[in-house]
Each structure stands twice: as structure tokens, then as C-alpha cells.
Amino acid sequence: VKYLLGHTVKSAALMMAILLGGCDQKHDDAHHIKVGVINGAEQDVAEVAKKVAKEKYGLEVELVGFSGSLLPNDPTAHGDLDANVFQHRPFLEQDNKAKGTTLVAVANTFVFPMAGYSRKIKQVSELKDGDTIAIPNDPTNLGRALLLLQKEKLITLRANTGLLPTAVDIIANPKRLKIMEMEGAQLPRVLDDAQVTVAIISTTYLQQTGLNPVRDSVFIEDKQSPYVNIIVTREENKDAANVRDFIKSYQSPEVATAAETIFNGGAVPGW
């Protein structure tokens, strides 16, 4: 699942105050933790972790749901939340840099894998010289798609381009593949385009297709992906007992099984 840095809205401070209203009391004991999550499917997964935490570790998990442009990093940094679960490392690094915060990743959760899909081929070896591959055009996902193509040995990227390479960083393209950049939401539609052999699509836009990343993809990210989602907290809180117990609860068989169902196979455990 992809989250990019959102723009600040004028009412953000007021809305945040309302959202966290009644949550001003700090809970520093080992038996309570307040965790920010994104409303919807991700909160459904966190509810399972909450149940595991109570039953196995006697830990009371208080979930605070977020949506729209309001994300959990600011209240985590300010101490209103103990931790959050919603982002991958590249997002956290970008957010820390932009805001001057020092939040840290303490555990992996799931990879919501980007993958290549096709209605014309079944495996990478069937790609022909000059075939067209459609990829997202926003910087984070464009870079992610190019790194996936490199993992499949279809292209080579210039060294030291990090997680945000662009098409100009391609230094080898043995099959002379044509890279077509477009808005992520449009990618599922080009699967039926006669000119496009493969479309690289994030799970964000899969719901309309009925595709399953593990079952239906030609190639896919694995759990070693740098885009694995993470549990995040403050530096001084990373070894706290409540954080450790929450990590164990989230990285449990019960949560993995629930995520498999909730995301229809679109969540790969990253631990």
C-alpha cells in the first residue's frame, strides 16, 4: 500500500485535535500502547493484533484510526501515540527529512507487493524485443517499478540511484523494452491494450481487476523489498516493553492468516 507525503490542509491541526480528543493522557506503563493506523483494511488487521496482544501478553492496545491527509507520524513524534503502522521505510525517511523528526522503524509488517501483470504472457521469458511495459509515473512508484524490472534482470540501473531512479538512469536494456509511464490508476485499464505487454501495478489499484498478486502476476516483489511496511515509534521508545509485545502480537500467525483473507492474498508477511 502506497502513501506519499500529502499537502497540509488548513484545518489539519483542528482535525487532529478532534481525532485525538480524549487521548491526552499519556500511557507509559508496559501494559498499554496507543497505535495509529489507517482506517479500513489495515485497521481490520490491527484489530487482530490487538486481540492477540490482550490474550497472549496482557497488553491493552488502543487503536486510533486516520484517513485522508491526516497521517499518524506527527502525533507519534509528539508523543500522542506510542507507535504507528501504515508506511514503508522510504516514506518514513522522506517524512523525517521533510519534518526534522527522528522516528524509527522497529519491525516489519507486510509487503503489499507491486507486481507485473499481463493478459498476453505468463512468464518473463516470453517477453519479446521491443515489448512495451507500462509503469506508474509518480516518483516513488516509478522508481519502485524500475527496481522491480532490474530485479528481474530486464534492465540495469546506474549505480547509487537509491530508491528513486528514473528512466534516464537505465544504462542497459537488452530487450529494448519500451517503458511507458502513466498514472497509477490508469494501469489496470491498459492490460487490454494491444500495445502493452505488461503493466506494473501496485496493490492500491488492484481491487477493480480481481487480480491476486501472488497468483496472477508475471513477476512480483518479495519480502526483501525495501517497501515492506513497518511499525514505527520514537527513538527513546524503541525498546519499551509495550512496543516489544505489540511487535510480537503483530508478527503472529493469527495476524498473517487474517491479512491473507482481508487482502485476498495481497499482503506478504515481511518478517
Where are the predicted features?
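Short, polar/charged alpha-helical segment
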Residues: 32, 39-62, 71, 77
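A conserved helix-loop-strand patch within extracytoplasmic ligand-binding domains
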Residues: 106-156, 256
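C-terminal motif of bacterial Sec signal peptides marking the signal peptidase cleavage site
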Residues: 19-22
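Periplasmic-binding protein-like
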Residues: 107-118, 143-150, 207-271
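Short helix-initiation/N-cap motifs at beta->coil->alpha
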Residues: 63-74, 161-189
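Beta->alpha turn/N-cap motifs
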Residues: 40, 67-69, 79-93, 110, ...
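Bacterial lipoprotein signal-peptidase II cleavage site
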Residues: 24-32
